[in-house]
Curated annotation (Swiss-Prot):
Gene coding for it: PB2
Entry-linked InterPro entries: Flu_PB2_2nd, Flu_PB2_6th, Flu_PB2_C, Flu_PB2_CAP-bd, Flu_PB2_middle, Flu_PB2_N, INV_PB2, PB2_helical
GO cellular component: host cell mitochondrion; host cell nucleus; virion component
Residue(s) at site: Mammalian adaptation: K627
HAMAP family tied to this protein: INV_PB2
Disulfide bonds: none
Keywords: Cap snatching, Eukaryotic host gene expression shutoff by virus, Eukaryotic host transcription shutoff by virus, Host gene expression shutoff by virus, Host mitochondrion, Host nucleus, Host-virus interaction, Inhibition of host innate immune response by virus, Inhibition of host MAVS by virus, Inhibition of host RLR pathway by virus, Inhibition of host RNA polymerase II by virus, mRNA capping, mRNA processing, Viral immunoevasion, Viral transcription, Virion
Organism: Influenza A virus (strain A/Memphis/110/1976 H3N2)
Record note on quaternary structure: Influenza RNA polymerase is composed of three subunits: PB1, PB2 and PA. Interacts (via N-terminus) with PB1 (via C-terminus). Interacts with nucleoprotein NP (via N-terminus). Interacts (via N-terminus) with host MAVS (via N-terminus); this interaction inhibits host innate immune response.
The name this protein goes by in its record: Polymerase basic protein 2
Amino acid sequence: MERIKELRNLMSQSRTREILTKTTVDHMAIIKKYTSGRQEKNPSLRMKWMMAMKYPITADKRITEMVPERNEQGQTLWSKMSDAGSDRVMVSPLAVTWWNRNGPVTSTVHYPKVYKTYFDKVERLKHGTFGPVHFRNQVKIRRRVDINPGHADLSAKEAQDVIMEVVFPNEVGARILTSESQLTITKEKKEELQDCKISPLMVAYMLERELVRKTRFLPVAGGTSSVYIEVLHLTQGTCWEQMYTPGGEVRNDDIDQSLIIAARNIVRRAAVSADPLASLLEMCHSTQIGGTRMVDILRQNPTEEQAVDICKAAMGLRISSSFSFGGFTFKRTSGSSIKREEEVLTGNLQTLKIRVHEGYEEFTMVGKRATAILRKATRRLVQLIVSGRDEQSIAEAIIVAMVFSQEDCMIKAVRGDLNFVNRANQRLNPMHQLLRHFQKDAKVLFQNWGIEHIDNVMGMVGVLPDMTPSTEMSMRGIRVSKMGVDEYSSTERVVVSIDRFLRVRDQRGNVLLSPEEVSETHGTERLTITYSSSMMWEINGPESVLVNTYQWIIRNWETVKIQWSQNPTMLYNKMEFEPFQSLVPKAIRGQYSGFVRTLFQQMRDVLGTFDTTQIIKLLPFAAAPPKQSRMQFSSLTVNVRGSGMRILVRGNSPVFNYNKTTKRLTILGKDAGTLIEDPDESTSGVESAVLRGFLILGKEDRRYGPALSINELSNLAKGEKANVLIGQGDVVLVMKRKRDSSILTDSQTATKRIRMAIN
C-alpha cells in the first residue's frame, strides 16, 4: 500500500511524467537487451506498438490488384511506399477486414477434415454436462496423462512417414509404410484431402495431432482419460472442483480402457493353465480389440497397468522399471539393498521363508486412490507419509507399507494359519500371504504397531489404530498429509525377463510384477474384444463354450475328419475341447467319454455307418479321460442355463439341432454355422466323380504320409501318389493321372476300385 501511495505521489509531479514519456533510452545495456538476437523480448509490447502504426502489415505486391486502395468509408487500405528491405507492400489492418468481407471465397469442404480434432472437441463440449462447483481441498498428484483426445497410436517416426506421404508425396526421401494402421490412415487421408488448399504446413501440424499420443506430466485430482484432461482448467482449481461429464468418448480412451480389461482377463486365464506363458502369448496373438490385433496395440500403447505390462513383458517389449505390490506402484527414489532369505515365525508359530531387503531405501507409492512416501531400513519402517481420498484408501496404503516393511511386529500380528492360494490353487508366496491376511482384517496389525507422540507439523496429522486423525498421537512412523505424492514422471523403459509363471523380473533379478498383482476388478469393455483362443470361451459363460466348441469343429471339419479316422487320440487331446469339460457333470465325464470313443471305433470298423452330424455332436464328450464301462446312453447331459440339458445321441434336441434341408446347425437356438455332410451319406458313389483324374491304386499305404482330404488333392503333381480320405472315413491310395484323356473312364472304374480297396 505504501509503495502505491509513493508511486501515485511521484506521478502527480509533472517532471516525472515528462521524464518517463519524453526522454530517449540511450543506455547501451538496454539497447543491447532489446536489439540482440532474433528472439522477440517483449512480444505483447511489440504487437501493441506495431498495431498503433498506420501500416503494420506487409503483403505481397499482388495485393494491390486484388484489394482497392480505399474502402467504402474512404480509408486507405495500403500504402504506395514499399517495405524497406523487401519487395512487399505496407498494408493497413483495415485491408484484412475488407478481404474478410469482400475477398474471394474458397471451398470450405476441407476445414472439418483438416481441423477434425477441433470440430470434435466442440461437439464433445456442446454435449458435455457441467455440474455444480464444490469448494474443498484438492489433493492433486502429477500423473502422466494423454492430452489430445481422438488420436491414433502411431510412433513419432511412423506418423512422420504418413504425414510426408499425405502432405508432401513428391518430396524425396525413403518412406516405409509397413503397419496396417499406417497404410489405412494414409489411404483415407489422401482421399479426404484431395485438392485441399489449406497450407501444407498447417495440414501437417493437424495430422500430427490426430496420429500421435501427446502426454504431459500434470497435477490431476480426478479422471485421467483424455476427454477429462482437455477440460482440466475448467474442472479443478486449487480449492475447487466442478463436476463434468464428457459429451462423447474418443477411441484412444476406449482402447486404453478395453486393453486393460482384455489384458486382465488373459493374465487371469493364463495363470490357471498348464503352461501360463505359452497360453498368455497364444491368447494375446489371437485377440482383437475393436478390430485391431491386441499385439499391435500393445506395441504402440504406452498404458502402464500390471496386466498390460505382463503381456508386454511376454512379448519381449520394454516396460517401466517400477514394481508393483498390493496394487501400488513402487519406485525407489534413493538408497539400495541386498536380498537375503530369512525364516520368520508368525504369531501362530508358522514358519515363513521371506526374502529380506537389507539396507536403507526410500520409495514413492502410487495407487488409484492413495499415494505415499515410504522410508525403510532392514525390516523396519522408518517413516510413511500417506495421502488419500478417504479413510479406506489411506488404510489400504498403510497396510501395504507395513507388510512391505517386513517388520517383526507385523509378522507377529498374524492370527491363524496363512494358506491363501491363487486362481490355479497354488499357494501364494509369503509376502502375498501376509498381504492377503491383513487386507482381510488389519485390526491386530494396527493395534500391535505401537503409537508415539508427535510434533505439530504444517499439513500433517497423526493417525490412530482405529484410523481417526489426531494432532497429538500417531501410529509409529506414520503421518497423513494433505499433499499427494507425484507419480513417477520418467517414461524410461527397461528390458525385463518373464518366467513360465508370468513373474516379471528386471535384469538384477528383482520381481517387478506377478499375476498376484493383477486387479480383480471387472469392468465392461467399451470396444468389442474378440478372443479367438478357446481358453477365453468360458469368459462369457457356459452357453458361449458350447456354441464356440461346435463352431470350431465345423470350421475345421476337413482336418478334424482326417484326424478322427487316422489319429483319434491326438484329436481327443486338443485344447479346444478343454473348456467343454466344465459343462459335463464331473461324476459321469469318464463314462460318457468311454461310451463315445467305443461308438466312434464301431463307426470306423463298420462300413457305411459314418455319420457327420453324430460325430460332430459327440466329439467334445470323447475328450475326457475315458472310463471303460458297459454303460449305454441315449442322451448326454450338459450343464447350461443353470440346469442340466440333454443332447440326444441319435436325433435333435434344443441344445443341438441339425436341419437336414437347410444344412444349418443351431446350438441352444443360436446359429452355429453350415454343416456340409459328406456326399456319400446321401448318395453313394459321388466320390467317384470327385476322384476324376485320379487312379485308385488300392488300400492306404502309410509311406505316402497322412491322408489328405478330397479338397487337398488338387495340389498333387501329375503322377504323384497320396492317401486320401473318402466318404465314410475310409482311406485309399490314389495317383494323379499323367494324361487328361482317360479322365472319363475314371468315374466308372473308381466305384469298383474303391469297393475292392476297402474290402
